[in-house]
Design a protein with these regions (language model features):
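A domain-level signal for the structural core that forms small-molecule/cofactor-binding pockets
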Residues: 2-72
C-alpha cells in the first residue's frame, strides 16, 4: 500500500485544491506502478504553521518563501 506525505504551509491550499492534489498524486503514482493500487494509495497532506519551516538554520514563513521564489 503506497503512502505519500505532502507538507504545505497552513492555509496555503483550499479544500478543493487539497482534493485535486490528492487525486493527481494518486493518479501519478498509479500510472507508474499499478492501477490496482489506486484504491489503497494513501496521500496525507499535512499543514505546517508558518514559521515552523526552516532553511539554512533560519525559520521561515510563507511570505519569506514567496520572496525567495520571486528572487527578492
Amino acid at each position: 500500500m503506497p503512502l505519500v506525505e505532502v507538507k504545505v504551509f497552513e492555509d496555503e491550499l483550499t479544500r478543493d485544491q487539497t482534493r485535486v492534489l490528492i487525486q493527481k498524486i494518486t493518479d501519478a503514482l498509479t500510472s507508474v506502478t499499478s492501477v490496482k493500487l489506486k484504491g489503497v494509495t494513501w496521500v496525507i497532506v499535512t499543514e505546517v504553521p508558518s514559521g515552523n519551516w526552516g532553511v539554512g538554520g533560519v525559520a521561515l514563513g510563507l511570505d519569506d518563501v514567496n520572496k525567495m521564489i520571486a528572487g527578492a
